[in-house]
Each structure stands twice: as C-alpha cells, then as structure tokens.
Amino acid sequence: MEIGSSKEVVVATWEFGAACVDAAVHTLKQGGTALDAVESGAAVAEADPGNRSVGFGGTPNRDGVVQVDAAIMWGPGRQAGSVAALEGILHPISVARRVMEVSPHVMLAGEGAARFALEQGFEEVDLLTEETRKQWEVWRETRAGEGENHD
C-alpha cells in the first residue's frame, strides 16, 4: 500500500494481520516513522485474545506460561533489538524496540528480558485468558505426557 508521497509498503501474511496492517498504515498517515508503524501493527496482534499464536491469550508453554518473542530492526542505522521467552509483558515489540534504542544488547531473553522491561516502566500483566488457562489445564490432564508439538 502506498502511503502519501513515499513508498512504504505494509504487508501481512496471516488473516489476523489485516488489523495490524490497518494500524501500521494509520500510524504512517499520522506522520509516524516506519519503526512506529511496525510497533503499532505488531501491538495489535499482541493484544488480540483471539489470536492464539502470540501475546495476550496466546497458547501457553507446557508449564502454563505464555512466553512471547519480538524483534525489530532499523536498516538505516543498522540497529536491532529483540526479546525472547519474555513473560508477563503485553507488548514485547515495544520492549524489543527499547532494547534497540537504549541497551547495548541486541537480544534479551527470559528473566533478563522481563527485568529490563520492568526497569523501563512496562507493566506486568497475566497473558493467559480464562479460556486459554482452561485449555491448558485440559491439555495438562490429558496430554502432558505425550510428545510435544510446540513450546
């Protein structure tokens, strides 16, 4: 999609990505940067409890914990930031951006990523919904001993 006089392109590959694209395009039309657009678009997916692949309401790991990952890159500055296995933070994309902008690191993971996020003022939240918690409990009771397909 062409935005204004520039040639920014916003693309999504999954059905839930349409709302993400809309948010990113809106950000660009409001004068935001490409980084702002990436962050706002990803944040839509992260906050959508209907999207079980990421973020709030996402499928928990075998321990019943939703862990999230995100990465962001800025080509002109050859910068990148990412987080992995982050727990309890709604918008990992924003934490990844903060890693890129204020940290000497390119990636933070697990407890270190969570500690950094909290130090940067991000709020801790429970990423499980009641529905995903119940689904995990059923899985734990019926399939926990079987082979795993995702964690």
PLM segments and residue spans:
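Alpha/propeptide regions of enzymes that mature by internal proteolysis
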Residues: 1-151
